[in-house]
Every structure is written in C-alpha cells, then in structure tokens.
Amino acid sequence: MATGSLRGLAVAGGGESSDSEDDGWEIGYLDRPPQKLKGPLPIEEKNETFKKALTTGDTSLVKELLDSGISVDSSFRYGWTPLMYAASVANVELVRVLLDRGANASFDKDKQTILITACSARGSEEQILKCVELLLSRNADPNVACRRLMTPIMYAARDGHPQVVALLVAHGAEVNIQDENGYTALTWAARQGHKSVVLKLLELGANKTLQTKDGKTPSEIAKRNKHLEIFNLLSLTLNPLEGKLQQLTKEETICKLLTTDSDKEKDHIFSSYTAFGDLEIFLHGLGLEHMTDLLKERDITLRHLLTMRKDEFTQNGITSKDQQKILAALKELEVEEIKFGELPEVAKLEISGDEFLNFLLKLNKQCGHLITAVQNIITELPVNSHKIVLEWASPRNFTSVCEELVSNVEDLNEEVCKLKDLIQKLQNERENDPTHIPLMEEVSTWNSKILKRTAVTVCGFGFLLFICKLTFQRK
C-alpha cells in the first residue's frame, strides 16, 4: 500500500450510524511509518496515541501500547472497541493481534456486532474473508442480527462477497432468515445485482420463493432493479446448483470453498451454469446428471426425452428408477389444456340461446387468456441474445412454431367470421319472418301501458279510502 494513501473510512458498518457526531477518531485509515513510544505517557495521551495507531494501522505501536497496560477492549467515545474499528477497515493483522491479546469477538454496540462490521467493511473480499474467518474462529455468532434484523450473511450478500457468504454458511449461518422488510440474503444479492452471490446462495440452498413484506420474490426484486440476467436466472423452474452444498458438513464445505484453487473452481461453476442447455438443466434438477453423456451420445434432445414412450426409455438404457423420476417431473411440467369438453354442446338443435351465448363467452375468455400469455412472453423475453442465461435451440425451431401459430390464428379468424355471418343471417331472416311471434318482453303496446297505469291508480285510490275510513272510526 502506498504511503499516505487513504485506505478506508471508519464508519459504522452495515449502514448503522454512530451515536455521536464527535467520536474521537481520525476518520480514515492512513499508511504511515511505524512509530515507537518515547517514554511513559499519561492515560489520556496514551488513549489518543492508541487511536492514532489503530487509524494508521501501526501494528507494532498497537502491540507496544497493549504491553504498556492499555485495555484491549477499550471503549471509545461512541462505544466502539479497537477490534470493531480494525474489522471495519478489514485490517487483518490488527484483527489478529487484538484477538490474540484477548479482544472480545462477540462484542456488540447497539446490536451492531463486530462480525457484521467485518462483513460490511471497506476492503477487498480477500481481506474481509480473512477477518471474518478470524472472528468465526473465536466463536463469533453468525446469526446475531442488527437493529434492522440483518445478519452478517445479508451484509456480505448485499456487498457482493460470495466467498464470505459461503464461509458464514459453513459456520452455521441461516441462509433463509429474513430481516425487518422480509429480505433474505438472496433478496439483497438480487437487489444489488451480484450474480456470483446469487449463484452461490442457490448452491447453498437459498429459497428463491420467499417474499418480502410487500409480496416481492427475489426475482421480482431483480427485475424491478433492472438486473434482467439475475431475473432470468431466478425464474428458472429447475436449478442445477440449488442445495448442492447444503448437505455437506462444515469441514467439507470449508475445504471445498477455501482451497487454493477456489477461484478457478468458482469460475468453472459459474461458467458451466451459464453454458448449460435445456437438457442439462432438466437432468441436474432431477439429480440425473449421470444420464447427460448417455443422452448426448444418442443425440436425444429434451423435446425427444419428454415425448418418449416406456419402451423407448428401456431401449435407450434408461433404468426404471430414472424413468420414474422423469415421468414424475413430466406431471409437474404438464400445461393444463383448455377443457373444451366442458363447453356446452352447440350441435344440438334444441340448445337454448343462453347456452349458446355462454359457449361464445367462454370461447372469447379463452382467447383473451391466450393473448395475455403471449403478451407476457413478449414482455419477459430479453431484447439482446447475450442476456439469455440458458443455451437455446436454433431460433429456426421457434420461428417455425410461431409461423404455425399465425396460420392457426388466421384459420380461427376465418371460422369465427363464418360463424358471425351465419348468426347475422339467422337474425335477419327471423326479423323478416311474418310468422315470427315476438317474445313477451318485446311486446309493449299502448293498451298494456294504460292497463298497468289504471290498475296502479285503482289500488292507490282504494288504499287511500282504507286509511280515511280507519281514521274516521278512531275519532
């Protein structure tokens, strides 16, 4: 680090504000040449020197001051301890020295823990990861929340640190815990657009269906914040990475995530995810990864797999156990077809007008649903091809199906026009038929109106006479 350069800001982590405007700290972490005590110092001057040593990251001076009797858990003006400050700027050496001297790793100030401060520190992920690892090794609780009910994993997810997230989960952090607004770590990562964190959380078993207090899922939060790639990713029905590390022990998870080749492995996982085709996604989601090579060797596509008969499964070497998994998944993926059998039978000559009208209304409603479905697809499809998360088949396949749809819609339009013309013809013939007897509700003659008015008048006059007679008898 360059001498005299500003390293980070000493502010409360995680967006928590301090209780004092004048906290007594020199804000900033400045690299300066190490200093030594010239002799015994008064207590007040010793505390001030201690602050400066922490601010400048002067590890040797901090050790010397601790040796001279200053408390490792000294409380400064707004309640921060030296360890909390060292964690806030991700100074690994200072954190290690203070912990070795007995600093309390579980300290909190107004529910702001040192672990939360470290997870929201200013610094590289490598430095933050080492600080968090040191604190966890001294039994810092990864599930203690701040005043806003945010836990360390939420801060790490919000700030885009996938390795820190994985380390916290390995030490028992709850992946699906929610803060005061219903946000989970996955929601925070989706909101901030951190794809690597989203993938890691899915791998660790994050629930992408949990909703915030205003009823939004992580995918909807991502869409609202214009992170369309993450929105597409979270909208997938099947996820090959979901829960992949959830069943591992803490030691196995740490070993898997923090090996020397962790970065290469991480990049491989992420790139392989984005390169998965529909078939791979389907198989991984069912735990049938072992079938991938077999199906590819036989040039079996997902469409072919989903339409196979039982004898074809056997011919292609798919075991009965695997067949059951595929068939069970097919039932879940089946799209409910429109049940036109429930519509009234219009072929009968004795059908009533109400039944025929009901048939037309239902038919119109189904068409409306189809229009809405197509409109939704048009809205959700990414404009640019590079934003598509999964590999798609050749666009020609989609185009040919769309052309068939257009042709069917044109045929439907033609048939509906014929039906309309036929109904119009029947209506005209009926109106011009001299033998046609109008419905009673259509007849409204002058005589009937006079009769109704007369009846009402007579009844009213009779009621008036009855009232007058009753009044006269009482008198």
Curated annotation (Swiss-Prot):
It comes from the Eukaryota. ANK repeats lie at residues 45-74, 78-107, 110-144, 148-177, 181-210, 214-243. One of its GO terms (cellular component) is pi-body. The modification Phosphoserine is found at residues 17-18, 20. Keywords: ANK repeat, Cytoplasm, Developmental protein, Differentiation, Meiosis, Phosphoprotein, Repeat, RNA-mediated gene silencing, Spermatogenesis. SMART domains: ANK (SM00248). Residues 1-38 are annotated as: Disordered. PROSITE patterns: ANK_REP_REGION, ANK_REPEAT. GO terms for biological process: cell differentiation; male meiotic nuclear division; regulatory ncRNA-mediated gene silencing; spermatogenesis; transposable element silencing. Gene3D superfamilies: Ankyrin repeat-containing domain, Transcription Factor, Ets-1. The keyword RNA-binding does not apply. Pfam families: Ank_2, Ank_4, SAM_2. The keyword Cytoplasm applies. Plays a central role during spermatogenesis by repressing transposable elements and preventing their mobilization, which is essential for the germline integrity. Acts via the piRNA metabolic process, which mediates the repression of transposable elements during meiosis by forming complexes composed of piRNAs and Piwi proteins and governs the methylation and subsequent repression of transposons. Its association with pi-bodies suggests a participation in the primary piRNAs metabolic process. This is Ankyrin repeat, SAM and basic leucine zipper domain-containing protein 1. It comes from Oryctolagus cuniculus (Rabbit). The gene is ASZ1.
